[in-house]
Amino acid sequence: MSPITPVPAAAARPVPAGPAMPETRPVESVQSAPGGAPSRSRTMRALVKHHAGPGLRLDAARPVPVPGPRDVLIRVRLAGICGTDRHIWEWDQWAASRIPVGIVTGHEFVGVVEEVGSAVRRVTPGQRVSAEGHITAWNDYNSRTGNAHIARDTMILGVDRDGCFAEYVVVPEENVWPLHPGIPDHVAAVLDPLGNAVHTVMAAGVSARSVLITGTGIIGLMAVTVARAAGAAQVLATDLDPRRRALALELGADEVFDPAGPGWIEQVRARTRGDGADVLLEMSGSSAAIDQGFSALRMGGTAALLGIPSRPITFDLNNHVIFKGATVLGINGRRMFETWYQMESLLLSGRLRLDPIVTHRVAMSDFARGFELMISGEGIKVVMEVS
């Protein structure tokens, strides 16, 4: 992995008023889930953003978080490494301006409920669960009108508060998602990015329509199999990496294109009555890919944008949106909790193919190798075995 020049940390940003942060003081050992499990230690292993620069550190004596009355303490089994974690690892401009030094990172996981607060009623110790990583107090306008995924007071697990790259994590009861026994652990550990793909595909209404996916990273690849399962008439995809293009074909894409090559937009039009794709799912955040994707979108088409550019971009609004009459959707996170029900239904239907995407499992002690696999492109989705 090539060295990365650290970006100076920005001034501390204000923390939005929202859900209370769990305490992390040492606690007396308590009994784990029923069944004779051993008592829990007062400390745990956790991956911490230990300084304002590249990398993470394994802290072997982090205090176990203490659940509040409406919180759930979860023992983490597997945790997924995602693009946000890579930003934090590399300490790019976004991470330096957003991530508090000392935080436990990570937000994708599967685990078992260890302990619940006194006011928790919906989950019990011993349940296998995942969780929605966007946490809100459910008080603002968006939360109260069905759009909690874009609430003003949202705090993100592993970004604004301690996350799941640890033996234990605390989340509010409302965010806990009990898992169907038909969903295996390695899939349950990556429901967060799968939810991004499902939200994007479902928002765009792909059934019986031609779909172009620009960028087949982890979520773009998931979008290929989700779009196919959701009834897309044709799925086309682009990526610079030939390995990812090949995997997109394996997951159900009808054709893939190298966006650096000539003539591929004309090929998309040739496959779509000469008009262009009905739907664009932009997953890359690349300025060039965004421009090309809108060029390949038909007049009156729908574009759903999930990819996040690393900096502001120049965009031909006149020709790509106004004169084209395009519908443009900004996609953020997962709809809480409509997307989770859709994910569960799709997974249990057997129509999603995710096993080829989850390529590596590493021990948490070998976390540096996990990040290297992801950054090099050798790994697609890497999950860590935490406990």
Task: Report the location of each language-model feature.
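Mid-domain Rossmann-like dinucleotide-binding core that forms the NAD(H)/NADP(H) cofactor-binding site
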Residues: 181-262, 266
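C-terminal substrate-binding/catalytic core of Rossmann-like NAD(P)-dependent dehydrogenases/reductases
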Residues: 311-360, 368-369
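C-terminal capping/lid region of NAD(P)-dependent oxidoreductase domains
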Residues: 2-3, 7, 18, 22-44, ...
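Glycine-rich beta-strand-centered segment in the early N-terminal region that forms part
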Residues: 64-79, 93-141, 180-182
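NAD(P)H dinucleotide-binding glycine-rich loop of Rossmann-like/cofactor-binding domains
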Residues: 98, 135-214
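Residues located in well-ordered beta-strands
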Residues: 45, 75, 110-112, 234, ...
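Glycine-rich cofactor phosphate-binding loops and adjacent beta1-alpha1 units
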Residues: 204-207, 250-327, 368
